[in-house]
A protein has these predicted regions:
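The feature marks the mature, well-folded catalytic cores of soluble enzymes
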Residues: 1-229
Length: 229
């Protein structure tokens, strides 16, 4: 039996950066380390971190458990409000936000300050999007067709960005629909899907063409590997 493994399989650069730096922080043993939520969507890696003493802070816990601790901001990033809350307890904040997510945060912050409405195409409950939305005053998330009906019927200028792990076809579809809704409005479109995501999406299509079946090995909580709604 022939097994065809994709050349882009494995951790992307953002995940590698977060994982390597978390292990590096743990090796210093300067203080107890907590990750604000799950560092990445990979249970094996999370188990390895737990085995060396790195703890995961969950939202249902009292934030006082972070007092005097080192707190790691996971690859998905967080909102400014969340960072402020963590900083009021932690001794040290280590920001391991993926550089592509940080780019979106910067765009949203910039254009929001210039008076633009921000339209984010992505999953509203995904940690990345929750964090990104925290950088805007006037922000809407489009994930399903019915979300388009929630957009205001006005002519306010807008910025459109995408979740880094979004399917390109979904981005193109919603951009076209938003443009159709706001024909006389200034709209700035930024395709912020990361290169690694597009590479994997394109590669799996090519692999499917030359094989009888395709298996995707992934964590069940990684919503971007599921079919788009």
């Amino acid at each position: 039996m022939n097994v065809d493994i994709g050349k882009f399989a494995g951790f992307c650069d953002g995940v590698k950066y977060a994982v390597e730096n978390t292990f590096s922080q743990a090796s210093k043993k300067n203080s107890d380390i907590y990750i604000d939520g799950h560092l990445i969507h990979n249970p094996q890696t999370l188990d390895m971190l737990e085995n060396i003493g790195v703890k995961t802070y969950e939202d249902d816990e009292d934030m006082s458990v972070l007092d005097g601790k080192t707190v790691i901001v996971r690859a998905h990033g967080i909102s400014p409000k969340r960072r402020e809350a963590l900083s009021s307890h932690a001794k040290k904040i280590v920001n391991l936000t993926c550089k592509y997510v940080a780019k979106i945060q910067g765009l949203v912050k910039k254009y929001s300050s210039l008076g633009y409405r921000v339209i984010v195409i992505g999953n509203p409950v995904h940690p990345e999007i929750v964090g990104v939305c925290g950088y805007a005053d006037d922000v809407y998330v489009v994930y399903k067709d019915e979300d388009l009906n929630k957009l205001p019927n006005d002519s306010k200028k807008a910025l459109i960005v995408a979740q880094t792990t979004l399917q390109k076809s979904a981005f193109d579809k919603f951009v076209a629909q938003i443009q159709d809704k706001y024909k006389d409005t200034e709209i700035i479109i930024k395709n912020t899907i990361c290169a690694a995501t597009e590479q994997r999406q394109n590669e799996v299509l090519e692999i499917a063409k030359r094989n009888d079946s395709v298996s995707v090995m992934v964590c069940y909580s990684a919503v971007h590997t599921l079919p788009y709604p």
